[in-house]
Regions:
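Core beta-strand elements of the Rossmann-like FAD/NAD(P) dinucleotide-binding domain
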Residues: 16-18, 164-174
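N-terminal Rossmann-fold NAD(P) dinucleotide-binding loop
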Residues: 29-30
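Conserved FAD-binding catalytic core of PHBH/FMO-like flavoproteins
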Residues: 80, 129, 154, 174, ...
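Glycine-rich FAD pyrophosphate-binding loop
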Residues: 37-57
Length: 513
């Protein structure tokens, strides 16, 4: 990545210099940049750090995220450095099982496994390399945005090249803040954070094993011990993570030091068997911003919401944000759909992410309980009838979808020849239709622009036929983020569905030209 500023950004142009400016180049920002350039948008990214952030952060993503990475073009690159997680178990201080969250190990409905463990710097490097290879984005490292001035048709962005000590500016049609919990863009939007009342300090430790330690196991374990709640997680290859809750009475001068860490890991591992790679003290928050958009300014990822890590859905939520927002920005900028489409970003995503955060807070209540009476009651209840936990599958909130299946995530079959649906479709709308409606659907796409916008997929293979039957429809429109946009039961509804996808708008623009 070039760590430079093009002097042209200081010139006055009748058109904005960029379609979208992204502030922050972590997983959310890098995923968004990849998806936007797939749709042909001109993107600029500002990142205040000079390299991939090295402190321990996310270690898990799910099959839906892997599907987004597939769209971005990095899924196969990631696979060699992933570990398929079998699930998570919650045990009390006596080691008795309370909650069993076993994940299916095979290929699931999203065309990928349900749970992957990863090393975040590997993911970020893959996203950055793919973006560089594809082109279409200017990436400015060690550049910090400090002012945003929203105009009628663009945003003026002022920033500092911190390596050179130079100030400059550029313009973009929209700005998306993927700049973390202390987001500058969120401050300019002026939104408040709703507090879901879970804030605890934990020390997060990444360890590299010197040799095999099969006894540690492949399951993540939540040790719900009131004396010291602790989490163990296996990573890919020889990586392991422990998360250790800071307790009242801990010596503030020693918390997080190597000596303090090894004392608390002695139950499982010693310095003779592993080395500390990195550690950090975090406060696990649970908050949601009350406004994710103001005009041409938007926020995503930790800038919009923060969750305790007990479901492994913090980074995943940001990836879903990027997936939801990218196609909407592209369609608005290309003129296929109105600007009001961007209002559906928050209305769809906020209830969805709230479900995961509230569930994580509830699980955190089990893990972090320290009151002796409450812990005793918890242990009696949960060991008497072990809970089998299943991952929530919330629908999107109100927005750009309709019908009984609208707002559900669509499946991605893996066919007998090993191919996946999304690879055949590409990053665009997909209309899954029964064989009788396939030709009318194809006939409706009378221009190359329409054909490029919507892929017609006849349901000739059993997985697609079965899914149509399950929805009770003859056609289902999958959005580029693979959520269901709507369904059709006959030719008239099919025509309306295609018009909803912006096909009519695309035709009108072509005729107007």
């Amino acid at each position: 990545m070039k760590d430079v500023v093009d002097s042209s950004v200081c010139k006055s142009n009748p058109e904005p210099d960029y379609d979208v400016a992204i502030v922050g180049f972590g997983p959310t920002g890098a995923t968004l940049a990849n998806l936007l350039t797939l749709r042909g948008l001109k993107v600029v990214v500002f990142e205040r750090d000079k390299d991939v952030f090295q402190l321990p952060r996310a270690v898990h993503f799910d099959g839906e995220c892997m599907r987004v990475f597939q769209a971005a073009g990095i899924a196969q690159t990631l696979l060699p450095n992933l570990f398929v997680g079998p699930g998570m178990k919650f045990v009390n201080a006596r080691g008795e099982l309370m909650i069993d969250w076993t994940r299916p190990g095979g290929i699931g409905p999203q065309g990928w496994c349900a749970s992957y463990k990863f090393h975040q710097p590997d993911l970020e490097r893959a996203l950055r390399a793919q973006l560089c290879s594809r082109g279409g984005a200017d990436v400015h490292l060690r550049h910090e945005v400090f002012a945003l001035d929203e105009r009628d048709d663009h945003v003026r962005i002022r920033f500092e090249d911190t390596a050179q000590g130079r100030l400059a500016h550029t313009t973009a049609r929209y700005v998306v803040g993927c700049d973390g919990a202390r987001s500058t863009v969120r401050r300019f939007i002026g939104t408040e954070l709703a507090d879901l009342k879970s804030h605890e300090r934990w020390v997060v430790v990444d360890v590299l094993l010197e040799g095999e330690r099969a006894d540690l196991g492949d399951y993540s374990i939540q040790y719900c011990d009131p004396a010291r709640p602790t989490t163990y997680t296996r990573g890919p290859h020889n990586r392991r993570r422990w998360e250790i809750m800071v307790m009242p009475g801990d010596d503030e001068r020693r918390i997080g030091t190597p000596e303090w860490i090894w004392e608390r890991l002695a139950r499982w591992i010693t310095p003779e068997h592993a080395q500390l790679e990195r550690s950090a003290i975090y406060t696990f928050h649970s908050v949601i911003a009350q406004g994710w958009r103001r005009g041409r300014l938007l926020i995503a990822g930790d800038a919009a919401h923060q969750t305790p890590p007990f479901m492994g859905q913090g980074m995943a939520a940001g990836i879903r944000d990027a997936s939801n927002l990218a196609w909407k920005l592209a369609d608005v900028i290309h003129g296929a759909l109105p600007d009001a489409l961007l209002d559906t970003y928050e209305s769809e995503r906020e209830p969805h992410v709230r479900t995961f955060i509230e569930t994580a807070v509830q699980l955190g209540g089990v893990i972090q309980a320290t009151d002796s009476d409450a812990v005793a009651a918890r242990d009696r209840e949960m060991t008497a009838a072990i809970r089998e936990f299943r991952t929530p599958q919330p629908r999107l909130g109100p927005g750009w979808h309709a019908g009984a299946a609208g707002g559900d995530i669509g499946p991605q079959p893996v066919f007998d020849d090993g191919s996946r649906l999304d690879d055949a479709v590409g990053y665009r709308f997909a209309l899954i239709v029964d064989e009788a409606l396939a030709q009318p659907a194809q006939d409706a796409l009378t221009t190359a622009a329409q054909g490029a916008r919507v892929a017609i997929v006849p349901a000739t293979r059993e997985p697609l036929r079965a899914w149509l039957a399950e929805t009770g429809a003859r056609a289902v429109l999958l959005r580029p983020d693979r959520y269901v946009g709507g369904v059709a039961h006959d030719a008239l509804e099919l025509e309306a569905l295609l018009a909803r996808a912006g096909v009519a708008c695309a035709l009108q623009r072509r005729e107007a030209a």
